[in-house]
Amino acid sequence: MAEGGASKGEEPEKLPGLAEDEPQVLHGTGHCKWFNVRMGFGFISMISREGNPLDIPVDVFVHQSKLFMEGFRSLKEGEPVEFTFKKSPKGLESIRVTGPGGSPCLGSERRPKGKTLQKRKPKGDRCYNCGGLDHHAKECSLPPQPKKCHYCQSIMHMVANCPHKLAAQLPASSQGRQEAESQPCSSAAPREVGGGHGCTVLFPQEVKSEMAEHSDRSPQEVSSTKAFAAIGEQNKKGPLIQKRKKT
């Protein structure tokens, strides 16, 4: 019987290397040093280990999966915590983190900013494959379509020969011509034609020929032409002067 009792009291032999392979779990207290809510990890500043205060705080790594709390898991900077940790090749890592007395952690008020997909604003351009407005040709789900005009979507011609595009451009060009014709002539040497309001631009050759004509004329002819020109100007100014007097 004594031998049996002695056999029961003996401790079972431990496997060699088991105690060395298993990391020792320790208990510590401290506060959150910093925590990145977007990446989900941070560090705890441990000020007490196994109930013994530390002269210099020690950093302990903490991951959001080790936090004891509901909802979005995070830590607020300076938040007091209690935790168990172990030694790893990378340093000290927390195993389970709670609030004081085993209560749930409070967590941070910050939330990671989600990646919002910016919707492309419609710019009026079409898909060159199907003509749709909500996508480009590289995003088109249809097989390659026959080539067609990008302006009117017709397969009978290309945009360079599109009659609809040419018809839309003609009114704009004719309007530009009308505006050019309605503007007064701003030439440095205007010539009055038949007493009207139109004018023509004298090119260098015309100026030379006109100067030659004046040189061939006699002084009497030149004076007579000046007199006719003065009479014409008075006739033009006459009605304007009468209208001003009536008003």
Swiss-Prot record:
Subcellular location(s) of the protein: Nucleus, Nucleolus
InterPro entries in the record: CSD, CSP_DNA-bd, Lin-28_RNA-binding, Lin-28A-like_Znf-CCHC_2, NA-bd_OB-fold, Znf_CCHC, Znf_CCHC_sf
Single annotated GO MF: RNA binding
Cellular component terms (Gene Ontology): cytosol; nucleolus; nucleoplasm
Domain notes: The tandem zinc fingers, also referred as zinc knuckle domain (ZKD), mediate specific binding to the GGAG/GGUG motif while the CSD shows only limited pyrimidine-rich sequence specificity. Both domains bind single-stranded nucleic acids.
Keyword field contains Lipid biosynthesis: no
Family from the record: Belongs to the lin-28 family.
Biased amino acid composition, Basic and acidic residues: 207-219
Keywords (A to Z) from UniProt: Metal-binding, Nucleus, Phosphoprotein, Repeat, RNA-binding, RNA-mediated gene silencing, Zinc, Zinc-finger
Protein's job: Suppressor of microRNA (miRNA) biogenesis, including that of let-7 and possibly of miR107, miR-143 and miR-200c. Binds primary let-7 transcripts (pri-let-7), including pri-let-7g and pri-let-7a-1, and sequester them in the nucleolus, away from the microprocessor complex, hence preventing their processing into mature miRNA. Does not act on pri-miR21. The repression of let-7 expression is required for normal development and contributes to maintain the pluripotent state of embryonic stem cells by preventing let-7-mediated differentiation.
Protein name: Protein lin-28 homolog B
Chain positions with Phosphoserine modification: S94, S103, S108
Compositionally biased spans, kind Polar residues: 173-186
Region spans: Disordered: 1-22, 96-124, 173-247
Entry's Gene Ontology BP terms: miRNA catabolic process; negative regulation of pre-miRNA processing; negative regulation of primary miRNA processing; positive regulation of miRNA catabolic process; pre-miRNA processing; RNA 3'-end processing; RNA destabilization
Binding annotation for Zn(2+) 1: C127, C130, H135, C140
